[in-house]
Amino acid sequence: MAAIVIVGAQWGDEGKGKATDILGGRVDYVVKPNGGNNAGHTVVVGGEKYELKLLPAGILSENAVPVLGNGVVINLEALFEEIEGLEARGADASRLRISANAHLVAPYHQTLDRVQERFLGKRAIGTTGRGIGPAYADKVARVGVRVQDIFDESILRQKVESALDIKNQMLVKMYNRKAIDPETIVEYFLSYRDRLEPMVVDSEYELNTALDAGKHVLMEGGQATMLDVDHGTYPFVTSSNPTAGGASVGSGVGPTRITHSLGIIKAYTTRVGAGPFPTELFDKWGEYLQTTGGEVGVNTGRTRRCGWYDSVIARYASRVNGFTDYFLTKLDVLTGIGEIPICVAYDVDGERFDEMPLTQSQFHHAQPIYETMPAWEEDITGCTTFEELPQKAQDYVLRLEELSGTRMSYIGVGPGRDQTIVRHDVLDEK
């Protein structure tokens, strides 16, 4: 029995989909415990590239059962569009399970998300506009609509009417928009009821029963540590907890059942949207990382901001997630660049910080303190063992391991499933 949680260690787009795809073929369940269709990931299988947004990467595994956990917020239109797109390419989505306790994203959530971002202007967070934040806000305010509610029309209608009592006041009086008819929302949800019903289960019970039977469960966190609503660069964060603790809450798998916490981290750093980013590059190297690394957001289409590896963030992520292992991705992107700077600490108004500063104001003003290492010139995309890597590449990985305080168990040397070096296999360890 193993319960493994996968967590992004930076600001997202680290390659969690690849990690899930590699491990997902050897586990019995792959669970998405948080987020919605706001966090895309790319998986390359058999030379074909799949871009997933709401569904877990385990949907492409032939054996694993994919699950959307209770912590996910689900846009039904986006869900079935994604399913249909995969099925058109020959994928089998019939094994998908959805928690009855997951919350639903309503059309009014998307409307409010877009209107509020425009209203904020320069103070906007930079959301995807897909209604994720408003859906989570309703969940916490206890006025959200859950998956199970669409199977009882009277409860559904009552919840929608109650939610729109307040939201229509906001739309009309604050944002000068038209009120939304509750009946159109009820009809929208009911139109998906028959297709949804076969997928809905008590996922918490099913997952724990599977673990009791000695099966393997992989939890695939969305977004990343630095976007966590509590532990990230607030307020430039998502609306859920995409850290290891959040995976437990969003799946119903208790924390003592988690055997490995696997952090996914790039050999450099990227970020999409607004917010502080100490190692961000504005020169030719930033453009090089964007171009060579293919740094364009799957979900937003926005070019990612790029910077050097930040070991302060890596240590912080290891601590708040209890990482047992790291999966280092995109090492190949750094081939042939001469020297590679590594951020080892911050300078904030003349004071050195080896760990995360206490306040967001300090973090916003943090300047990176770098050490440099020589890059390698050799093509590493065909390397299959750590020993096959050029010595300079090995030295770089070992230095990141030392600075991060967590072993680098997997190393990505290309986008393909088979372009991964395995130093320690979490599924072979107790």
Curated annotation (Swiss-Prot):
Localization (cell): Cytoplasm
EC number(s) recorded for this UniProt protein: 6.3.4.4
Keywords: Cytoplasm, GTP-binding, Ligase, Magnesium, Metal-binding, Nucleotide-binding, Purine biosynthesis
UniProt-annotated binding residues for substrate: 298-304
Catalytic activity: IMP + L-aspartate + GTP = N(6)-(1,2-dicarboxyethyl)-AMP + GDP + phosphate + 2 H(+)
GO BP terms in the entry: 'de novo' AMP biosynthetic process; IMP metabolic process
Binding, IMP: 13-16, 38-41, 128, 142, 223, 238, 302
Statement: the UniProt record of this protein carries the keyword 4Fe-4S: no
Catalytic center residues: 13, 41
GO molecular function annotation: adenylosuccinate synthase activity; GTP binding; magnesium ion binding
Primary enzyme class: ligase
Residue numbers binding Mg(2+): 13, 40
Residues engaged in binding GTP: 12-18, 40-42, 304, 330-332, 412-414
Summary of subunit composition and partner proteins: Homodimer.
Protein family per UniProt: Belongs to the adenylosuccinate synthetase family.
Biological function: Plays an important role in the de novo pathway of purine nucleotide biosynthesis. Catalyzes the first committed step in the biosynthesis of AMP from IMP.
NCBIfam families, per database record: PRK01117.1, purA
Protein name: Adenylosuccinate synthetase
Lineage of source species: Bacteria, Bacillati, Actinomycetota, Actinomycetes, Mycobacteriales
Gene from which this protein is expressed: purA
